[in-house]
Amino acid sequence: MMSMNSKQPHFAMHPTLPEHKYPSLHSSSEAIRRACLPTPPLQSNLFASLDETLLARAEALAAVDIAVSQGKSHPFKPDATYHTMNSVPCTSTSTVPLAHHHHHHHHHQALEPGDLLDHISSPSLALMAGAGGAGAAGGGGAPTRPRGAGGPGGGGGPGGGGPGVAGRRRGPGGGGGGPGGGLLGXSAHPHPHMHGXGHLSHPAAAAAMNMPSGLPHPGLVAAAAHHGAAAAAAAAAAGQVAAASAAAAVVGAAGLASICDSDTDPRELEAFAERFKQRRIKLGVTQADVGSALANLKIPGVGSLSQSTICRFESLTLSHNNMIALKPILQAWLEEAEGAQREKMNKPELFNGGEKKRKRTSIAAPEKRSLEAYFAVQPRPSSEKIAAIAEKLDLKKNVVRVWFCNQRQKQKRMKFSATY
């Protein structure tokens, strides 16, 4: 029985021609034309190689018949033991754009007849379906198959059973073929300088591509599992970090939301507007004075406001966003005004002659209703009663006394107008 490992006669399949920088750009017809040029040392050798091709085909078919009749197959060997069987010339037809190497012109050893014809018709091919195709390894497949396709015969030869894949396409029914079969593509090229930066992402994967497709090496499987576990652990750690970051972001957002809710609560805004109005009245400051005094706070982006804006804030007729924006500004002014008022009360005045005209006093509605109730009971209260009312309503005694005087004058005018 003829083995694929046996030494076969050395055939010079085609003359050694200088390859171009980009051989994949030249068509097969151009290659045939160059092969048939009338060069004196090569012209006589061309037809001799064709005769040798036919003889090799006959020998290969005979080997297939012997293998089928005996029904035996060689023990499976890794692809690395048949390194010299796959030594095809290294051209730049690889799928990864690498630097242009100096081509090593190896003579083709133990190539099948279909591969020889295909190589003569298209010399720009570098990687063909030699072992996964037809002939001695294919188990009765057609000897001439288009490039990049597996042989139709299934696994009859030695080491068969893997998918005959060449280049980037899969054959219609391709068997695994002979000892050098399996995956034959750009990544399984025997020359080490072709394994560049883009073929495979991991050495274990690259070694798995060089193995026959039927049975991967256990060491490669273990290496791939180890690196897969490491990648899974790294992904889990990254997921934990991302989850922690997301949790921190959620906690921070919740804290900001709780802070902002206290400022944007409508009930809180309403209570502040009422407190601001009462304290402004106690200070004896008008709404127009508040609006003009805001420019003195030196707050960036804040100038003087109109009296109508302060009035709308106190009556809660501003928009919600404007109320939120105006609240800290008015609160800052109120604290500064009350601080100035306390300092003024603590300092004794040197003389009262230079005092300006007293401003008009405004009384809030609740206090006004209480005063009207006291006036209905006693229009002319005593000095002690006026002091008690002022202390109860948190007003000045003079303000309460003047209000009672004004209210009596108002009632007198109303009676006079009703009589006449």
From Swiss-Prot:
Native species: Rattus norvegicus (Rat)
Subcellular location field: Nucleus; Cytoplasm
Function: Multifunctional transcription factor with different regions mediating its different effects. Acts by binding (via its C-terminal domain) to sequences related to the consensus octamer motif 5'-ATGCAAAT-3' in the regulatory regions of its target genes. Regulates the expression of specific genes involved in differentiation and survival within a subset of neuronal lineages. It has been shown that activation of some of these genes requires its N-terminal domain, maybe through a neuronal-specific cofactor.
Main location, first listed in the record: nucleus
DNA-binding region: 356-415
Domain POU-specific: 261-338
Record keywords: Cytoplasm, Developmental protein, DNA-binding, Homeobox, Nucleus, Transcription, Transcription regulation
Full protein name: POU domain, class 4, transcription factor 1
Tissue specificity field: Detected in brain, spinal cord and dorsal root ganglion. Isoform 2 is detected in brain, spinal cord, dorsal root ganglion and spleen.
Motif (POU-IV box): 57-66
Comment on protein domains: The C-terminal domain is able to act as both DNA-binding domain and a transcriptional activator. The N-terminal domain is also required for transactivation activity on some target genes acting as a discrete activation domain. Neurite outgrowth and expression of genes required for synapse formation are primarily dependent on the C-terminal domain, however the N-terminal domain is required for maximal induction.
SMART domains for the chain: HOX, POU
Region (Disordered): 94-117, 132-200
Subunit-structure text: Interacts (via N-terminus) with RIT2; the interaction controls POU4F1 transactivation activity on some neuronal target genes. Isoform 1 interacts with POU4F2; this interaction inhibits both POU4F1 DNA-binding and transcriptional activities. Isoform 1 interacts (C-terminus) with ESR1 (via DNA-binding domain); this interaction decreases the estrogen receptor ESR1 transcriptional activity in a DNA- and ligand 17-beta-estradiol-independent manner.
Biased composition (Basic residues): 99-108
An MF annotation (GO) of this entry: sequence-specific DNA binding
A GO cellular component entry from the record: RNA polymerase II transcription regulator complex
Family listed: Belongs to the POU transcription factor family. Class-4 subfamily.
Domain of life: Eukaryota
Comp. bias regions, Gly residues: 132-165, 172-184
GO biological process: cell migration in hindbrain; cellular response to cytokine stimulus; cellular response to estradiol stimulus; central nervous system neuron differentiation; habenula development; heart development; innervation; intrinsic apoptotic signaling pathway by p53 class mediator
